[in-house]
Curated annotation (Swiss-Prot):
Zinc finger residue extent: RTR1-type: 50-136
Enzyme class: hydrolase
A GO BP entry: transcription by RNA polymerase II
One Gene Ontology CC term in the entry: cytoplasm
Subcellular localization: Cytoplasm; Nucleus
InterPro entries recorded: Rtr1/RPAP2, Rtr1/RPAP2_dom, Rtr1/RPAP2_sf
Main localization, broad class: cytoplasm
Positions with a binding annotation for Zn(2+): C73, C78, C112, H116
Superkingdom of the source species: Eukaryota
Native organism: Saccharomyces cerevisiae (strain ATCC 204508 / S288c) (Baker's yeast)
Protein name from the UniProt record: RNA polymerase II subunit B1 CTD phosphatase RTR1
Length: 226
């Protein structure tokens, strides 16, 4: 399992003498991070949130794709395999795109469950589009603008949001918030889509309440839905 210290040691140590990264240095950091997590997973939520400092949405998608190539769930907090493992080279891009857009269970080729699919979506839409080399000082272990980095690249995990909103009356407001972030299931959201998402949230919130009473393991251990 990868920790914040692993990320620092693997990707950041060589670049501690200057605040401004070159494009090449930023690419090296990105490749090291993807290499570290393509066949492993983040040890805890804190580590995944720390990664948000260095990732763009496109870089995150590259990480998901690399994890899938290694038969791992795309969500970096998970150590399981996707529910449905497919050979990524068995179809062309057109066929792949068609399946993703028309198969309601296409996410199971990339994630172990719908829950981690939602978690991954929620994480990705919060990532900054700003190039890593433009994020001055974000890679430094000690920087006078650390507090600013914490604010600028702050990421809230879906699991955290559910824990904070763990009551039935908050479901609709949570759905509204997800839509504002562009987290609707498809670009043309329908009433059926809204109902499906609401049902998902109701189910997960109910399981959270059980977790709080029985003190089991983390949310990431949710099994897939039938």
């Amino acid at each position: 399992m990868a920790t914040i210290e692993d990320i620092k040691e693997t990707a950041l140590i060589p670049f501690q003498k200057h605040r401004q990264l070159s494009m090449h240095e930023a690419e090296v950091i990105t490749l090291e991070i993807i290499g570290l997590l393509c066949d492993s997973e983040c040890k805890d939520e804190k580590t995944l949130k720390y990664l948000g400092r260095f990732l763009t949405p496109d870089m995150y998608q590259d990480l998901v794709d690399e994890r899938n190539l290694n038969k791992r769930c795309g969500y970096p907090l998970c150590g399981k395999s996707p529910e449905r493992i497919r050979d990524p080279f068995s179809m062309n891009d057109t066929t792949k795109k068609f399946l993703l857009e028309n198969n309601p269970y296409a996410y199971l080729s990339h994630y172990c469950s719908k829950f981690h699919f939602r978690c991954s979506q929620f994480y990705q839409v919060q990532l900054s589009d700003e190039a890593l080399f433009a994020r001055t000082g974000v890679h430094l272990f000690e920087d006078p603008e650390q507090d600013k980095h914490d604010i600028d690249f702050k990421v809230t995990l879906f699991e955290e949001l559910l824990r904070e909103k763990a009551s039935e009356e908050d479901i609709k407001s949570l759905i509204s918030g997800l839509k504002k972030l562009g987290l609707n299931p498809d670009s043309g959201t329908t009433e059926k889509d809204d109902t499906e998402l609401e049902d998902d949230l109701s189910k997960w919130l109910a399981q959270i309440k059980i977790v709080e009473n029985d003190n089991p393991s983390i949310l990431g251990d949710f099994t897939r839905e039938d």
